[in-house]
Amino acid sequence: KVAVALLIALVAVVAFAFLQPHLPGQVDPNLCEVDPVTGIQYRNIAPGEQGFIWGSNAIGQDLWARIWAGARTSLTIAFFVALIEAVVGITVGVLWGYVRQLDFFFTELYNICDNIPSTIILILISYVASPSIQTLILGMSLTGWIAMARFIRNQILIIRDRDYNIASRCIGTPTSRIVVRNLLPYLVSVIMLRMALTIPAAIGSEVFITYIGLGLSVEIPSLGNLINDGRKVMMQAGLRYQLLYPTIILSFVTIAFYLIGNAFSDAADPKNHLQ
């Protein structure tokens, strides 16, 4: 029940994040607003004042608009990373587990990639390439598929030589058909679980790489940028809302994805359905 409630809330938050700019009365997240009477730029307006729902930052930008724009950016990065890791991981995992001739090659490739810290790769790519959404997606996806591929490979090894698969090979069924019809349907729950856990990990990586100054530029709202900006003013009691609101959104999204992923894993595990 908790997982279902979290799932409903998470879907609502994600849907609102992407629908928010199309709702009436929304403003540009990069617009620096000024007082219409005095013409002076707004600075650090408290939440609920001057029409700012969640307040403004030091240059008059609406935090309500920026936080939802940041959530869209971070979620977009996370969704693409999860999709790329799933496609590459499934492809490599199936070949690794089903085609015996490729086992040595993929095992050595796995050993090489697995011994290179993914954080180091992400930092190096972000440092060498210009900061952009595409750069972050590339850096996170470059080795992120390894865990998915290994998991798929292990599952393939378990079901590869079952009677119905051996029979299919004996009657000349194409390998591609065996994989699609006999193997992948058993892996749907595993794939969904891995993707659900990849999303919060990717969001966390975006926040981390932006926090150390190698992430997206300040012109692109992201949860990492917003938390980094809030950190700079957190010692001023009246400005802590600039850190509080993006942190709440980040915490909810990452924890919800993690708990839902674990609940989905438990529900899909046959051991939990034994009488």
Task: State the predicted function of each range.
Residues 126-130, 156, 204-249:
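Glycine-rich helix-loop "coupling/hinge" segments at transmembrane-helix boundaries
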Residues 10, 94, 123-127, 136, ...:
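Transmembrane alpha-helix boundary and packing residues in multipass membrane permease domains
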Residues 79, 83, 87, 91, ...:
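Hydrophobic alpha-helical segments of membrane proteins
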Residues 8, 68, 80-84, 109, ...:
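Hydrophobic residues within alpha-helical transmembrane segments
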Residues 1-86, 90, 94, 101, ...:
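Gly/Trp-centered helix-boundary motif
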Residues 61-76, 80, 100-103, 107, ...:
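Amphipathic cytosolic juxtamembrane alpha-helices at the membrane-cytosol interface
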Residues 53, 84, 89, 94-98, ...:
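Generic hydrophobic transmembrane alpha-helix motif, especially the helices
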Residues 145, 149, 202, 253-257:
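Alpha-helical transmembrane segments
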